[in-house]
Design a protein with these regions (language model features):
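Post-HExxH zinc-binding segment in Zn-dependent metallohydrolases
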Residues: 194-251, 255, 259-285, 289-301
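Auxiliary, metal-adjacent structural segments of Zn-dependent hydrolase domains
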Residues: 61-166, 197, 201-203
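Short, intrinsically disordered terminal tails adjacent to the first/last structured region
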Residues: 1-11
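Active-site-proximal alpha-helical
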Residues: 254-283, 292-362
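Active-site recognition of the HExxH zinc-binding catalytic motif
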Residues: 181-193, 270
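Short pre-active-site segment immediately N-terminal to the catalytic Zn-binding motif
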Residues: 166-183
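N-terminal Sec-pathway targeting helices
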Residues: 11-30
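Non-catalytic terminal regions of proteins
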Residues: 24, 37-83, 88-96, 123-127, ...
């Protein structure tokens, strides 16, 4: 039995490599066929109507905003800093597909499928990139939600601004994280503020007199909002604001200086989010919160004194809202965009704030 078993074992071992070779050939054929089908499908392209509803909505909203920028750049975008004039990459957290919009270089890749956008107001050129596109795997796994200032991301030869999005960017009302609102805000930091100093935090607290002056400022900002398009009233209120700002700076110089800079950096970005929202019909503006819209600025100090909000709100949220309202005031008083040109001329070493821009519009240089 021992001798007869050996030849059988040797015979079996000689057949094993051949079996694995046959399995390997079959797998290779399957991979080649699947790859060929995939490449053929990508070459043929895909209709926007075939996309996941969230992905489709993001592309359609982007196209609507881009068309508004083309039609009315003075109101929908910032002077010389329109994000939609650059290649963009949208990364879907839901489907894990990515969408390359208006590439600067010709796209030729088995991982890229042209998307037929159909009724596309901005005439976008769009490619869907596969979930497993190797270049994007590090960004999907370890990258942030969007490009930060100074960060370069190149996809298919195009330097892009990327943004990740998901269902939560479409299912909330009055939200600064609504898709196009969020895109316009964050992309403005990238394209519009690359030469601005971005150390925009507020530390410390206002003095008791400073809180009183803040209350007066809140009253004026509500009055600005209530004035609508009344130019005479807006100019009157702007003059009062400039006078008040001198008092505030004298009372709390360090705090007010930090506040002015933060409301310039974040207020301008919030303003861009507001204009983008208006372009696509999404309801968003200054003092919008998850549970309410158009809250009154004049509620801030009473809420502070009653403990309903604390100084963190004054330091970390109010500059976004007050800055956006100042931008809307400047846009109403100087629709030609001279205030934006004024802010664009600043550098990393020389700050120009929204209060400075208001003084510039009124010929009151600092």
């Amino acid at each position: 039995m021992g001798k007869s078993a050996q030849p059988a074992t040797m015979k079996s071992s000689r057949r094993l490599p051949r079996r694995w070779w046959e399995i390997g050939v079959i797998l290779l054929v399957v991979v080649i066929i699947a790859g060929s089908v995939h490449v053929a499908r990508n070459t043929a392209g895909i209709s926007v109507g075939e996309l996941d509803p969230i992905d489709r909505r993001a592309l359609e909203e982007y196209s609507e905003y881009a068309a508004a920028v083309e039609d009315a750049p003075d109101s929908a975008a910032w002077l010389n800093a329109a994000a939609t004039e650059h290649p963009t990459l949208l990364i879907s957290r839901k489907t894990h597909f990515s969408y390359l919009i208006n590439p600067s270089q010709e796209v030729s890749s088995p991982f890229a499928a042209p998307v037929d956008m159909g009724d596309n107001p901005a005439g976008l050129e769009v490619y869907r990139l596969d979930r497993i596109y190797p270049r994007l795997l590090p960004i999907k796994v370890a990258g942030g939600s969007f490009n930060t200032v100074g960060e370069t991301t190149t996809v298919q030869g195009s330097d892009v601004y990327y943004l990740k999005f998901g269902e939560d960017n479409f299912d909330k009302q009055f939200s600064s994280e609504h898709f196009i609102t969020f895109f316009a805000h964050e992309s403005f930091h990238f394209y519009g503020q690359a030469r601005w100093a971005l150390d925009s935090r507020v530390f410390g607290e206002l003095s008791p007199h400073g809180v009183e002056l803040l209350d007066e400022r809140m009253r004026l900002l509500d009055a600005v909002r209530d004035a609508g398009a009344d130019q005479a009233r807006l100019r009157e209120l702007a003059t009062e604001l400039l006078a008040l700002e001198k008092e505030r700076l004298a009372a709390d110089p360090d705090y007010v200086s930090q506040e002015r800079w933060m409301e310039t950096v974040e207020g301008t970005a919030t303003y861009l989010g507001i204009m983008a929202s208006r372009a696509v019909g999404y309801d968003f503006g200054p003092m919008y919160f998850d549970n309410t819209k158009e809250a009154r600025f004049t509620d801030v100090v009473p809420f502070l004194e009653s403990g309903q909000i604390d100084n963190d709100f004054l330091r970390n949220r109010l500059p976004y809202e007050a800055g956006a309202q100042l931008c809307l005031l400047l846009a109403a008083l100087a629709p030609s965009g001279e205030w934006q040109a004024f802010l664009n001329e600043q550098s990393l070493d020389s700050h120009r704030t929204l209060v400075d821009a208001l003084g510039h519009v009124f010929g009151q240089e600092k």
